[in-house]
Amino acid sequence: CVKYAMEPYGIHLEGEKELRKFIGPPLRFSFTTYCGLSEEEAEKAIVRYRERYIPIGVYECELFEGVRETIQAFKEAGYIQVITSSKPEAQCRQVLEKFDLLTELDEVVGASHDGRIDTKIEVLQEAFRRMKAQYADFSKEQTVLIGDTHYDADGAKEGGIDCIGVGYGFGGAEEMWNAGAVAVYEDQKALREALV
């Protein structure tokens, strides 16, 4: 989808390493920072990205091994589970529906199409707001973010919560440790064993 979005600008992105940097941060940031687009061009590129992502790209992703079992184990343990993503909320829900996981979660919070909620900290703040509205005893002190890129760890730090990293994701274990994760687990089984 990133390649498709960049075609009109003559920007050709190849290889996994070059494309991986687009996973995690908001598209607006990525297109201006990594591709040198102006704010106006980035907005047009986001529209083009979504032209492909919504009908096609959303169905090309795969669930990491063990994620379903972890979500189910956390649910059985009574944990409140909220997905927070820099992707637009509607697309997050689409992906979760594809994997039949939407009903397993308590809330899904993503970026807004108008740019009001865009960065990880903005998404987290919206998640905190919703949790406080839904759960009288909600406390940030009992909240942890599980993530796979430094954007997750940075957002957690800025939001005043701990981040637990997973080493098999897009950032890798070293990135998560360097970003300040309080723990890093190499697979879902180890994560479940540590937290349930």
Go through the PLM ranges and name each one:
Residues 13, 21, 43, 61, ...:
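Non-catalytic, surface-exposed connector residues within folded enzymatic/regulatory domains
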Residues 24, 28, 64, 68, ...:
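Alpha-helix N-cap/helix-start and coil->helix boundary motif
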Residues 1-68, 77:
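N-terminal helical cap/lid subdomain that shapes the substrate entry/recognition surface
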Residues 17, 72, 95-196:
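Asp-based, Mg2+/Mn2+-dependent phosphohydrolase catalytic module
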Residues 64, 85-86, 146, 166:
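Active-site-adjacent beta-strand anchor residues
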Residues 2, 70-96, 109:
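Substrate-recognition element of Asp-dependent hydrolases with the DxDx(T/V) motif
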Residues 57-62, 86, 162-163:
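Short, flexible loop segments at the rims of nucleotide/cofactor-binding pockets, characterized by
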